């Protein structure tokens, strides 16, 4: 962890943690500048776009939430940004991404200043998949916001989302709505739009999830913000809804954020990719790093001659 930058109400550091021996998760750690006894923590994965960790909207949501009292870890999707030890579309990318998210969670919970009862996660598109998958299998995620991804009819357009496969096999079939339902009874906000596979959310996916939450007696823990005139992104109106939900359920500093839903992001300075990179000439990738996906597969004892769809049959 290095290159601490003091910003307006928050700090940004460049960080790499070891997911397993020789495989590194690269990201940025956003912290509140104001000292507190305990902080909420938020995992911030992203979707499919080159260098997306460096984009304005990932920086904006991470910095805003840090300014309001959360430690936020924004990290690269496997095969994107600085995570170049393997291709993204490799057979076990879903496994690697899920494991990476668990390791990010492990790291955040290892910080003595983090409140283990106030852990959130949010991402858009492929980051939304990472959000509802980890929330489904790890009860340590207390509040989740999958954005523009929960769909009853679309598994995800990439091997990292549906390639294992986890949705359909010889003896079962499921979908992402049932995965999202596994968040119950924990607070969950589903954000959807009118221009992608989440267009039916108010009439299809959300009513199903409402029934699941009602069966736990916690209907008030589930919300849907549907933006019918918007497209597939994690834009300002979606971030605004996410901010309010996290502030409410993670008990962030509402005095700074909920004055007439004051979610102004103008205080945030967007940093260049060069200032956010973990590995450079001064801080190169460690010498024990696995160099390619063959080395990764061999280290994890996966056979390298099988089709990706045959890895998980036995």
Predicted stretch roles:
Residues 30, 45, 75, 122-124, ...:
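Generic beta-strand/beta-sheet core signal
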Residues 16-20, 27-38:
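Short beta-strand-to-loop junctions in surface cap/lid or active-site-entrance loops
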Residues 1-24, 184, 191-314:
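Alpha/beta-hydrolase-fold serine-hydrolase catalytic core, especially in secreted/extracellular enzymes
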Residues 33-113, 150-165:
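Cap/lid segment of the alpha/beta-hydrolase catalytic domain
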Residues 49-60, 88-99, 121-132, 163-178, ...:
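Alpha-helix capping and helix-loop boundary segments enriched in small/acidic/polar residues
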Residues 143, 155-214:
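The feature captures the conserved acid-bearing segment of alpha/beta-hydrolase catalytic domains
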Residues 106-172:
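Primarily recognizes the serine-hydrolase "nucleophile elbow" in alpha/beta-hydrolase
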Residues 38-40, 68-71, 115-118, 139-143, ...:
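Loop/turn elements at helix/coil->beta-strand transitions in domains of secreted/extracellular proteins
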């Amino acid at each position: 962890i290095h290159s601490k930058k003091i910003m307006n109400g928050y700090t940004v550091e460049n960080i790499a943690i070891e997911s397993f021996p020789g495989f590194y998760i690269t990201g940025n750690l956003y912290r509140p500048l104001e000292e507190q006894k305990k902080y909420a923590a938020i995992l911030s994965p992203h979707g499919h776009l080159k260098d997306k960790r460096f984009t304005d909207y990932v920086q904006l949501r991470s910095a805003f939430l840090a300014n309001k009292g959360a430690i936020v870890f924004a990290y690269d999707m496997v095969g994107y940004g600085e995570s170049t030890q393997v291709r993204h579309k490799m057979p076990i990318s879903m496994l690697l991404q899920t494991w990476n998210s668990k390791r990010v969670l492990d790291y955040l919970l290892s910080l003595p200043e983090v409140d283990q009862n106030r852990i959130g996660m949010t991402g858009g598109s492929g980051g939304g998949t990472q959000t509802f998958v980890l929330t489904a299998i790890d009860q340590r995620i207390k509040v989740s916001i999958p954005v523009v991804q929960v769909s009853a009819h679309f598994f995800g357009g990439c091997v990292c989302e549906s390639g294992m496969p986890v949705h359909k096999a010889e003896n079962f079939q499921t979908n992402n709505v049932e995965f999202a339902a596994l968040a119950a009874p924990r607070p969950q906000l589903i954000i959807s739009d009118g221009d992608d596979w989440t267009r039916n959310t108010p009439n299809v996916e959300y009513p199903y999830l409402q029934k699941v939450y009602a069966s736990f007696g916690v209907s008030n823990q589930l919300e849907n913000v549907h933006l019918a005139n918007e497209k597939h992104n994690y834009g300002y109106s979606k971030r605004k809804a996410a901010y309010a939900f996290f502030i409410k359920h993670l008990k962030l500093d509402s005095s700074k954020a909920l004055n007439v839903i004051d979610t102004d992001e103008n205080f945030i300075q967007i940093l260049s990719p060069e200032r956010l990179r973990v590995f450079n000439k001064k801080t190169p990738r460690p010498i024990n790093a696995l160099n390619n996906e063959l080395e990764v597969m061999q280290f994890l004892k996966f056979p390298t001659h099988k089709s990706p769809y045959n890895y998980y049959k036995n």
